[in-house]
Amino acid sequence: MRASAGERERVEALYAWERRLQRQGVARIAGVDEAGRGPLAGPVTAAAVILPPGLFIAGLNDSKKVPPARRRELAAVIKKESLAWGIGWVSVKEIDCLNILAASRWAMRRALSALAIRPDHVLIDGMELPGLKIPQTPLVGGDALSASIAAASILAKVARDELMVAYDAVFQGYGLAGNKGYPTREHREALRRLGPCALHRRSFKH
């Protein structure tokens, strides 16, 4: 289906930060975002993506604004069309040993390390990565401001959701395939009834 002029304009506007850096001579720009800071269960997942300059992907947006089925379609396109992409994970045990902010930063670092191409600059959603030896720009609400971060937000969300669906068959009774570990009413009721499983974060209030 052909994208409307308005949709093309919207997606092109997401490249404003990338174009600004490219005008300064920066070639390879990675967007980084995480998923899973708020759940009671499961890992924190991050993704890093380097897109070709100006690549048009119809529907590209902050993952929270994209329906699940469309997110999966977009993830496949992003993996196929990107110059490089990587996923980083931080386990429940690591989250409990660190804290959720530190765990999110570690997931982002691991996603960057998983890239087959080293970026020249990193656009990060909402936070800075201390000690990163690559120039970086943190953008609050970056998944709605940068195409690269939006692409990363989709990959991170899809990867984590798929894992939580798989975990639902192992840790039954918590509805993980539906709630993805987030603190829904049904999830909290299951916790009261069953107690926490190995996937639940002990450092979070249940």
UniProtKB/Swiss-Prot annotation:
Naturally occurring in which organism (per UniProt): Moorella thermoacetica (strain ATCC 39073 / JCM 9320)
Catalytic activity from the UniProt record: Endonucleolytic cleavage to 5'-phosphomonoester
GO BP term, example: DNA replication, removal of RNA primer
Cofactor detail note: Manganese or magnesium. Binds 1 divalent metal ion per monomer in the absence of substrate. May bind a second metal ion after substrate binding.
Cofactors required: Mn(2+); Mg(2+)
Family: Belongs to the RNase HII family.
One Gene Ontology CC term in the entry: ribonuclease H2 complex
UniProt entry keywords in alphabetical sequence: Cytoplasm, Endonuclease, Hydrolase, Manganese, Metal-binding, Nuclease
RNase H type-2 domain span: 27-206
Subcellular location: Cytoplasm
Protein name in the entry: Ribonuclease HII
Matches recorded under NCBIfam families: PRK00015.1-1 (NF000594), PRK00015.1-3 (NF000595)
Pfam family name, one: RNase_HII
